[in-house]
């Protein structure tokens, strides 16, 4: 029996010829990432155990994205702690408050490549599976072990394959696809399984759209999300590495044709419509027309799910087409990274957002984490392009968050209420 792409990557990383689901392996780590929230916990754990040197300062990426600039004395103290650690350890790849969200910055700086094992002290590290890597989130204590040894144990996960075929309808995006999948599978339906996305629809998707898919694998319990690499992937990775001086050899790994999957879902893309993930669970997915008409207070366009140039283009196109946003709606726009921000500036997108009264923030986690920007008050309703709508995620426990695509979110900003973008 053949192996899936995830099984092959873990076999290679652990020095084995083959592995099977359920096997325990000790894998060599290619890239380890922490940010300003999880990094201090990792550093303090290293100190507690008397570890004075990291295993490889060139394989560690440290980045500030959650509380940037520092929004409290505690946040500032954490930044100071991490900057000191970077200097003491000679960490080569450190991105201070200026660069953006970790899950956008890592691939665009060339830190993720096909066939690699990438771990991050953040649950949405699964995003990087869009590049054919085994990427997963881990805790800060496990990360301390990685910093010290360069290794981590894994139980080889089973793989669920999502075969997505057909053409997406107008106003439907990969965000609608992944929300529809989560609505079908459930928030725990893929617990500790690798969620592999494939089929002709995925092949046609841009890298940005693929990242939206893998980003949300964790929202159905997935150990990782992954897409087998193709020419699009290889071109993106090579260009990013060349641009930022992070070139290194990598191996393009694909699964065997006779690999065995735990489950296979057949997804007909042409039947997917614009949807919302309604409060207060990501799998509470309803077609947009089912819940249309509910007044809203805020729209957030950004995050590691949908803050890329492609997303900003889609959103401003809707807003511009319909002459602006509703008077009673606040719109917070946060580009995912400085590079994406600069591209949007060059295209005039940022100017247009400002023209129509949107608030454009620095690249960061922004309103997604209920800190710094766009905190919701009691009873307020927000349409967000982010990945979680749990109670209290963006502020008050009494607020409501509806997850949607950038197109649908922008349409809601125009209308001032929940709406199917096809009905504007």
Curated annotation (Swiss-Prot):
Q: List the disulfide bonds.
A: none
Transmembrane feature ranges? none
Organism lineage: Archaea, Methanobacteriati, Methanobacteriota, Methanomada group, Methanococci
Q: What cofactor(s) does the depicted protein rely on? A: [4Fe-4S] cluster
Annotated function: Enzyme with broad specificity that catalyzes reversible hydroxyacid isomerizations via dehydration/hydration reactions. Catalyzes the isomerization between 2-isopropylmalate and 3-isopropylmalate, via the formation of 2-isopropylmaleate, a step involved in leucine biosynthesis. Catalyzes the isomerization between 2-methylmalate and 3-methylmalate, via the formation of 2-methylmaleate (citraconate), a step involved in isoleucine biosynthesis. Also displays malease activity, i.e. catalyzes the hydration of maleate to form (R)-malate.
Q: What is its EC number?
A: 4.2.1.33, 4.2.1.35, 4.2.1.31
Q: Where does [4Fe-4S] cluster bind?
A: 304, 365, 368
In the UniProt record, does the keyword Oxidoreductase occur?
no
Q: Partners and quaternary state?
A: Heterotetramer of 2 LeuC and 2 LeuD. Cannot form a complex with HacB.
Which Pfam family, any one of them, does this sequence belong to? Aconitase
Summarize the temperature dependence annotation.
Optimum temperature is 70 degrees Celsius.
Originating gene: leuC
Please state what the protein is called.
Answer: Isopropylmalate/citramalate isomerase large subunit
Q: Which reaction does it catalyse?
A: (2R,3S)-3-isopropylmalate = (2S)-2-isopropylmalate; (3R)-citramalate = 2-methylmaleate + H2O; 2-methylmaleate + H2O = (2R,3S)-3-methylmalate; (R)-malate = maleate + H2O
Q: What class of enzyme is it?
A: lyase
What species is this protein from?
Answer: Methanocaldococcus jannaschii (strain ATCC 43067 / DSM 2661 / JAL-1 / JCM 10045 / NBRC 100440)
Biological process (GO), any one: isoleucine biosynthetic process
């Amino acid at each position: 029996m053949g192996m899936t792409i995830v099984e092959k990557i873990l076999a290679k990383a652990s020095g084995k010829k083959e592995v099977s689901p359920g096997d325990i392996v000790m894998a060599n780590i290619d890239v380890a990432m922490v940010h300003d929230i999880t990094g201090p916990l990792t550093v303090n754990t290293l100190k507690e155990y008397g570890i004075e040197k990291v295993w490889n300062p060139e394989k560690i990426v440290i980045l500030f994205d959650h509380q940037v600039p520092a929004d409290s004395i505690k946040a500032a103290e954490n930044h100071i702690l991490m900057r000191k650690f970077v200097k003491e350890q000679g960490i080569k790849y450190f991105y201070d408050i200026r660069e953006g969200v970790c899950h956008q910055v890592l691939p665009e700086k060339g830190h993720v490549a096909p066939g690699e094992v990438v771990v991050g002290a953040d649950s949405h590290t699964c995003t990087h599976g869009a590049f054919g890597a085994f990427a997963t989130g881990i805790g800060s204590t496990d990360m301390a072990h990685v910093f010290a040894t360069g290794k981590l144990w894994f139980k080889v996960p089973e793989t669920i394959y999502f075969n997505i075929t057909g053409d997406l309808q107008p106003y439907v995006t990969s965000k609608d696809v992944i929300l529809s999948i989560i609505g079908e599978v459930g928030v725990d339906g893929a617990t500790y399984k690798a969620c592999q996305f494939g089929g002709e629809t995925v092949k046609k998707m841009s890298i940005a759209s693929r990242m939206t898919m893998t980003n949300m694998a964790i929202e159905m319990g997935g150990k990782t999300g992954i897409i087998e690499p193709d020419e699009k992937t290889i071109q993106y990775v090579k260009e990013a590495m060349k641009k930022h001086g992070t070139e290194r050899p990598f191996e393009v790994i694909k699964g065997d044709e006779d690999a065995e999957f735990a489950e296979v879902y057949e997804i007909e893309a042409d039947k997917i419509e614009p949807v919302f993930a309604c409060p207060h669970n990501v799998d509470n997915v309803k077609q947009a027309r089912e819940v249309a008409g509910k007044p809203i207070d805020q729209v957030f366009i950004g995050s590691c799910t949908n803050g890329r140039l492609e997303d900003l283009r889609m959103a401003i196109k809707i807003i511009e087409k319909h002459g602006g946003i509703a008077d009673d709606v606040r719109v917070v726009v946060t580009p995912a990274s400085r590079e994406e921000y600069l591209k949007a500036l060059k295209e005039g997108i940022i100017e247009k957002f400002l023209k129509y009264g949107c608030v454009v923030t620095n690249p960061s986690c922004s309103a997604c984490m209920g800190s710094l920007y766009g905190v919701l008050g009691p009873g307020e309703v927000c349409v967000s392009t982010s990945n979680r709508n749990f109670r209290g995620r963006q502020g008050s426990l009494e607020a409501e968050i509806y997850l949607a695509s950038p197109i649908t979110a922008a349409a809601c900003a125009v209308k001032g209420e929940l709406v199917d973008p096809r009905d504007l």
